[in-house]
């Protein structure tokens, strides 16, 4: 077991702790975790842009996620959809289908940015959590967002999946809120957003 002090952006010390004796269940050697950041249209629809511009961003909600769910169903794969709340307002039907088919829906901010104040951040988190509960019947278990620690303290998330810090799950202890959080690393290399950042 290793513990190492690190510094966060807000100068708060934390400790990282590997999960002792961690093994995947059932003798599995490798696990691939499929997640979808369902960010469709949040940068366009609410800006009241011209219709032709908006049409470029409609694919994810009108077609893309539906097709992904078809593929996941064909291969009996369950995944996690990280949802900005505004996207949930725009495309509730595809999310209801995802829930019916056993997929998890988790918090990915309200409009894909972290507000400048804790008060606004708490409002955004609550709005997204409430919307997800309305769609799924339960509050989300995790988040993919760089939320302030003080904001995380008041939410019942069991995991955070935001940074590519390793290959295996691990725990992080946040000193100023006295709470351990499970970290599920991600890989930006396999994130298709990398290919589109400069085109939008």
Predicted segments, located by residue:
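Catalytic grooves of carbohydrate-active enzymes
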Residues: 187-200
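Catalytic alpha-helical scaffold of carbohydrate-active enzymes acting on polysaccharides/glycoconjugates
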Residues: 2-189
């Amino acid at each position: 077991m290793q513990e190492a002090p690190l510094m966060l952006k807000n100068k708060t010390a934390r400790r990282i702790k590997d999960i002792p004796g961690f093994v995947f269940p059932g003798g599995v050697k490798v696990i691939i975790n499929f997640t979808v950041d369902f960010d469709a249209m949040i940068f366009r629809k609410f800006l009241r842009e011209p219709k032709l511009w908006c049409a470029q961003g409609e694919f994810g909600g009108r077609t893309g996620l539906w097709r992904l769910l078809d593929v996941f169903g064909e291969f009996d794969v369950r995944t996690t959809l990280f949802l900005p709340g505004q996207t949930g307002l725009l495309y509730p039907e595809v999310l209801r289908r995802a829930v019916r088919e056993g997929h998890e829906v988790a918090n990915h901010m309200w409009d894909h940015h972290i507000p400048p104040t804790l008060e606004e951040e708490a409002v955004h988190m609550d709005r997204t959590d409430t919307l997800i509960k309305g769609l799924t019947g339960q509050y989300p278990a995790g988040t993919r967002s760089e939320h302030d620690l003080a904001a995380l303290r008041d939410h019942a998330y069991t995991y955070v999946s935001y940074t590519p810090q390793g290959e295996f799950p691990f725990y992080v202890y946040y000193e100023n809120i006295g709470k351990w959080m499970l970290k599920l690393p991600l890989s930006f290399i396999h994130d298709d957003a990398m290919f589109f950042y400069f085109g939008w």
